[in-house]
Amino acid sequence: FYTSAEKSQAHLNAGAKKVLISAPAKDETTPTVVFGVNHEILKASDNIVSAGSCTTNSMAAMVKLLNDKFGIKLGFMTTIHAYTGTQMILDGPRFPKARNNRAAAINTIPHSTGAAKAIGKVVPSVNGKLQGHAQRIQVPDGSVTELTTVLNKEVTADEINAAFKEAFSNTEYYGYNEDGIVSSDIIGDTHGGVFDPTQTDVNTVDGTTMARTVSFYDNEYGFTCNMIRTLLYFAEISE
């Protein structure tokens, strides 16, 4: 994969005008852009940009709103993620980690994710405050990100949901759905992520509030749609 500025330079050398990497960049200098969250940092002079990952896109708007409205002290995210093409169809020796060699369609497989680190490039004010993990599950598409955060303010679940409903009821890049959906319902959705208010939960003890918020996403199509929005904006400012 051409997932660093150094390797992506080959595309520019071959005649491409711009490069948008469809994965987290493996260097510290390439900007990471999620449309609707920080796409306005793009400049016409930028030549190589990362769109992050599907999981980064699913949670970026959620993280930014929580931080802007209530302040995030720290947090942990888990993506319950559809299996991907990098996994095994059948058990067999391929990867150094034994778990990664197990058949994807019949196992829940703990996996790493770079989304928590990448989110710090998209929302710099939370850089270093989040950690993350993935569970690859037995579905071919349709994923969900659970974000647990300790907030700076005391807040209720209703207040969190109201903030998300106001912000995202009518945006193309991030959605809001209170219909009690499941993972198959999200397949074909064009948003980078869809907030599910029915799963919001809050626990406040001695003035400290911990909140659980959830975002569904089509990890294939939804991510692609949001990446295309970034690409179109990139092209527009580069004309």
What are these regions (language model features)?
Residues K64, K121, K165, R229-L232:
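Generic alpha-helical structural context detector
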Residues C54, H111, N152, D218-N219:
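Structured loop/turn residues at secondary-structure junctions
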Residues Y2, N57, V155, Y221-G222:
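A generic structural signal for alpha-helix starts
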Residues S22, A51-G52, T108, T149, ...:
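Glycine- and other small-residue-rich loops at beta-strand/loop junctions that grip anionic moieties
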Residues F1-N101, D206, R229-T230, I237-S238:
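N-terminal Rossmann-like NAD(P) cofactor-binding subdomain of oxidoreductases
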Residues T190-E239:
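NAD(P)-dependent Rossmann-like dehydrogenase/reductase catalytic/cofactor-binding core
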Residues A5-E6, A60, K117, D158, ...:
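Alpha-helical elements of the RecA-like P-loop NTPase motor core of helicases
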Residues G71-L74, T79-A211:
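C-terminal substrate-binding/catalytic lobe of Rossmann-fold NAD(P)-dependent oxidoreductases
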